Design a protein with these regions (language model features):
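Auxiliary Fe-S-binding modules of radical SAM enzymes
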Residues: 1-42, 46-51, 97-202
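Histidine (H) residue identity feature
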Residues: 25, 54, 70-71, 88, ...
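N-terminal pre-triad scaffold of radical SAM enzymes
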Residues: 42-71, 158
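A cross-family glycoside hydrolase active-site/sugar-binding cleft signature
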Residues: 59-61, 71-75, 105-108, 149-151
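Conserved non-cysteine loop/helix-boundary elements of the Radical SAM core domain that shape
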Residues: 63-98, 116-129
């Protein structure tokens, strides 16, 4: 574990994540209440690379009905309490334990129907820190989900690129060229993999 986090109040949780231990509700509350975004990021990145290495899947201009795979979502922000978010995440984790049917999870800062088809600057009322925190905590707690997905139409290209260090390994959106998406992923030190509608590579 990096010595940088030796004095972090989340040090013990970083240790648990490194050891592959599942975090309980009390630990999740601590994550939600923490402002240590770097500690959250290191835990999420450990989980991300354990599951997917440096691979980052992407899909451009996906049709609304492009897949039969199961994807879960959660709206976060001012209209949803922290406890409601945690309840949602733990219910999903339990359901995934039982069924194993979900392919990916997408934390959303606003309703998907509000996404601009050609916008790449991000919309919504959350801050960048809140967005990264939502991505990281989702990755840390949903240890039985293979993919955490983000949309550059919601986050904007720059924050989407940063999210690749905070647990995200699957990108989607519209209004951007394939070359630009690949470049964004590669400049974040990741490997770009175009995916099909089922969450796998083409």
């Amino acid at each position: 574990m990096p010595s940088l986090f030796a004095k972090s109040k989340l040090f013990d949780l970083i240790d648990k994540v490194e050891k592959g231990e599942r975090l309980d509700h009390d630990a999740a509350v601590r994550l939600m209440n923490s402002q240590d975004i770097l500690a959250l990021g290191i835990m999420a990145n450990i989980m991300r690379e354990r599951k997917n290495g440096h691979q980052t899947f992407y899909r451009i201009n996906p049709p609304f009905n492009d897949t039969n795979a199961h994807h879960a979502t959660m709206i976060y922000g001012n209209l949803v309490s922290r406890e409601e978010q945690l309840d949602h995440l733990f219910r999903l984790r339990a359901l995934q334990d039982q069924t194993g049917e979900f392919v990916s999870f997408s934390p959303l800062s606003s309703d998907p129907k509000d996404q601009p088809l050609d916008g790449t600057t991000g919309i919504g009322t959350t801050t960048g820190i809140e967005d990264l925190k939502a991505m990281a905590i989702s990755r840390i707690l949903l240890d039985n989900f293979d993919h955490i997905k983000a949309s550059w139409n919601l986050l904007g290209l720059k924050l989407t690129q940063v999210s690749l260090a905070f647990g995200v390994n699957d990108l989607t959106g519209s209004g951007v060229t394939k070359k630009a998406v690949i470049q964004m992923i590669q400049k974040a030190g990741r490997v770009a993999v175009e995916r099909d509608g089922l969450g796998g590579s083409q």
